[in-house]
């Protein structure tokens, strides 16, 4: 696997060193004991098997030319079918690749598979193309230069493309070129029966698990702004990204717009946002209420979308004119998820089988890392999510729902401002002080995870170490990815495009170098063979689907919308 080392970034102009509100490391005398961690979460025990957290990673990346231009070519056939390859597909655009790992208990296995997908892909791209390693896109010429993803001639493939056409007509193509990382998380099956017993719950295990994942989601919403501060890596963008749109960004140079204290513009008004959804209150207190909220949005026509109409030849330009074409159009920092059966709608699967895992959607690509994420960040995410699951999580009401959204926006735009104030239950609270308090509480979750991930019976240190890295970012904002990027742009006189292209080339070389060095290893050959077989089989699977009798698409679409 690729080995990455942390190094201190150049100190940004707004680099801060907190005094009275500085967060403390949790590595030595300040580290919570195992007993105090159990007491903090009101647990009788934390079994060894409970630490077998299961995670998977989905990563999006644009295909670009060696000069940083968005690829205009179709999805490479050597990567298989975008419809049926479970590991390599496309998101909105033909040029926006999406890599999907399997779910693993071992972090190293998950990242190893992600690295293998990268290496397999890079050795099969044409025209010396590479992957853009930043969340904000490369310089864009215009909407016509962003090809919508194609999934073949079957009705299900046409539906996937039509959904993307709908997104294009509703929000524009440019917004959809933003890339991110989705982190899928679940607790091991062995955890739930014993935890249910500890909680004194006498209902069904399915309902208990579902309610506890909703419990996690509510806490995640309350504190997701902290992840945006710590891992946000989109403080600036090319001017082409906002061409013709209103914005409040400042000019950094001839080609770059930014905000001085911004962390993650991807999660702000320029990113995955929908004006139509701003007033939508989606409740996470109860699965039925959550499903009802989304179901209503998927069956309520929206006048602005009705006005889109049909194409010049009468062809549909979106799946329907409802507020949401389908479940995935609802923009959120986290989603309750369940693996679906063939032909099953996600909401129907959730209502039938309950929540199986959660999907974190608030993470930028880190352009300083070859994979956009590393083991240390993964350990912190596990710590954060375990804390969200075990800590108290009151039910959310409408006022808090919109307060949480406002807090997120403030951190997106001003997160590195040392004077930033947020709102907690209607009262102002300093962001730095609040973040220090949360990080302090996370020490208990780190202790639990380290207690079962040590070697030879010794207490581990990896989760506490990952937490301490984030504490350092709070105490010095120049250590955050956003602070590091702006400092490098300012110190070296680089535009966002120049910095992102430079970093993309560096990571491209690192990944290809690691691939060449691993050529003779059994693991590399096994990966190569596996991805090759999957790609070939996926093309055959798509051909088989397309050879089956198909309804005419209009009839298929009408039946799908009526379901």
Where in this protein do the model-derived segments appear?
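Terminal catalytic/cofactor-binding subdomain
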Residues: 2, 12, 16-168, 175-179, ...
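Secondary-structure capping and boundary motifs in well-ordered enzyme cores
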Residues: 53, 155, 159, 175-179, ...
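Histidine-centered divalent-metal-coordination microenvironment in nucleic-acid enzymes
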Residues: 60, 175-188, 357-364
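A glycine-rich phosphate-binding loop feature that marks nucleotide/adenosyl-phosphate handling sites
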Residues: 137-139, 238-241, 401-411, 460-472
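Loop-rich catalytic cores of soluble enzymes, especially ATP-dependent carboxylate-amine ligases
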Residues: 158-170, 177, 186-350, 370, ...
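Extended, compositionally biased alpha-helical segments that mediate assembly or anchoring
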Residues: 456-563
């Amino acid at each position: 696997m690729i080995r990455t080392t942390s190094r201190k970034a150049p100190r940004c102009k707004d680099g801060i060193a907190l005094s009275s509100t500085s967060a403390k490391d949790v590595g030595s005398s300040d580290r919570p004991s195992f007993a105090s961690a159990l007491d903090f979460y009101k647990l009788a025990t934390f079994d060894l098997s409970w630490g077998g957290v299961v995670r998977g990673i989905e990563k999006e990346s644009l295909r670009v030319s060696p000069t940083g231009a968005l690829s205009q070519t179709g999805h490479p056939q050597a990567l298989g079918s975008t419809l049926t390859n479970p590991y390599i597909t496309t998101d909105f655009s033909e040029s926006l690749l999406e890599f999907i790992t399997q779910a693993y208990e071992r972090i190293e296995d998950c990242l190893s598979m992600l690295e293998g997908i990268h290496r397999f892909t890079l050795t099969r791209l044409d025209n010396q193309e590479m992957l853009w390693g930043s969340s904000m896109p490369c310089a864009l010429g215009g909407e016509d230069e962003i090809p919508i993803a194609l999934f073949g001639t079957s009705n299900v493939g046409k539906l996937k493309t039509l959904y993307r056409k709908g997104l294009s007509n509703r929000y524009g193509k440019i917004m959809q070129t933003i890339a991110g990382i989705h982190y899928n998380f679940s607790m091991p099956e062995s955890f739930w029966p014993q935890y249910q017993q500890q909680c004194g719950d006498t209902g069904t295990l399915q309902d208990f698990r579902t309610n506890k994942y909703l419990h996690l989601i509510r806490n995640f919403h309350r504190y997701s702004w902290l992840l945006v501060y710590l891992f946000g890596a989109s403080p600036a963008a090319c001017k082409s990204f906002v061409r013709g749109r209103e914005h409040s960004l400042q000019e950094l140079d001839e080609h770059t717009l930014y905000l001085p204290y911004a962390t993650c513009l991807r999660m702000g008004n320029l990113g995955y946002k929908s004006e139509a959804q701003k007033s939508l209150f989606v409740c996470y207190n109860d699965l039925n209420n959550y499903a009802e909220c989304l179901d209503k949005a998927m069956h309520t026509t929206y006048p602005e979308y009705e006005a889109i109409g049909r194409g010049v030849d009468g062809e549909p330009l979106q799946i329907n004119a409802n507020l949401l074409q389908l479940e995935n159009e609802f923009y959120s920092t986290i989603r309750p998820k369940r693996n679906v059966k063939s032909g099953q709608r996600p909401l129907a699967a959730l209502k039938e089988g309950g929540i199986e895992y959660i999907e974190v959607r608030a993470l930028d690509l880190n352009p300083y890392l070859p994979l956009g994420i590393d083991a240390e960040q993964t350990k912190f995410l596990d710590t954060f999510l375990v804390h969200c699951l075990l800590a108290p999580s009151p039910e959310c009401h409408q006022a808090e729902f919109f307060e949480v959204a406002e807090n997120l926006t403030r951190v997106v735009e001003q997160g590195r401002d040392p004077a930033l104030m947020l709102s907690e239950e209607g009262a102002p609270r300093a962001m730095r002080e609040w973040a220090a308090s949360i990080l302090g509480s996370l020490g208990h979750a780190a202790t639990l995870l380290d207690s079962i991930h040590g070697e030879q019976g010794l207490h581990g240190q990896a989760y506490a170490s990952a937490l301490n890295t984030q504490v350092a970012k709070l105490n010095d904002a120049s250590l955050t990815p956003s602070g590091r990027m702006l400092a490098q742009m300012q110190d070296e006189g680089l535009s966002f495009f120049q910095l992102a292209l430079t970093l993309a080339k560096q990571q491209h070389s690192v990944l290809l170098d690691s691939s060449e060095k691993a050529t003779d290893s059994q693991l590399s050959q096994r990966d190569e063979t596996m991805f090759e077989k999957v790609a070939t089989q996926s093309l055959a699977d798509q051909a088989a689907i397309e050879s089956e009798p198909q309804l005419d698409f209009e009839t298929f679409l009408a039946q799908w919308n009526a379901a």
